[in-house]
């Protein structure tokens, strides 16, 4: 049901559906066979219907983790909540939020001043999409988007590399001992300049 929704009814977000095999590989890389994990907090800032989070919770153990999510699509968020119900994660239902993560992140620290940080963060964000209507709001938060915010292409607004903002958000949302995994386009790794290169330098220099 979830897969059919993503491939047939997900609208403009459908292309970002994560295949189950990829989600499983990411979860195994993050968690391994560690049986000593308890009270883990897992987060996806572009959760869609929750494929990555479900794989992660299965790898950790549903009874040993709490799920947190946010997604801009109301329809996807409703399907994610169904996914939580079907996978025995009822206690996490209130943590599944519909909204714009980049402009208005919901999950914050207790004092509301900082982003909440998690043990595990996973994401398969939109690689390129028209975010021109919120670009200036995002750019007005340099502390969060320290590597910069991509410009809106003059001719093809939908080719804005918005995924670079999600990478920065993922890094900001990790505990010092946390682990993250994010699906990115292959060109990111070989970037020699721009926002992508700044992010790569931070990952290496700060040993993220």
Regions picked out by a protein language model, each given a short descriptive name:
Residues 1-10:
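Long recognition/docking surfaces used for binding and targeting
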């Amino acid at each position: 049901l979830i897969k059919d929704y993503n491939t047939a009814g997900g609208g403009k977000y459908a292309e970002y559906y994560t295949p189950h095999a990829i989600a499983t590989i990411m979860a195994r890389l993050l968690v391994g066979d560690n049986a000593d994990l308890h009270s883990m907090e897992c987060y996806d800032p572009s959760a869609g219907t929750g494929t990555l989070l479900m794989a992660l919770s299965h790898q950790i153990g549903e009874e040993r983790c709490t799920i947190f999510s946010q997604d801009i699509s109301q329809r996807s968020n409703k399907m994610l909540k169904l996914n939580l119900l079907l996978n025995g994660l009822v206690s996490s239902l209130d943590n599944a939020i519909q909204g714009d993560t980049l402009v208005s992140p919901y999950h914050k620290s207790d004092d509301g001043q900082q982003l909440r940080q998690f043990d595990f963060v996973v994401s398969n964000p939109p690689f390129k999409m028209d975010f021109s209507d919120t670009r200036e709001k995002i750019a007005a938060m340099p502390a969060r988007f320290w590597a910069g915010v991509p410009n809106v292409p003059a001719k093809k607004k939908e080719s804005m590399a918005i995924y670079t903002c999600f990478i920065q958000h993922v890094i900001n949302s990790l505990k010092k001992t946390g682990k993250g995994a994010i699906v990115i386009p292959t060109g990111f790794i070989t970037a020699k300049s721009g926002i992508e290169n700044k992010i790569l330098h931070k990952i290496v220099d700060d040993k993220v």
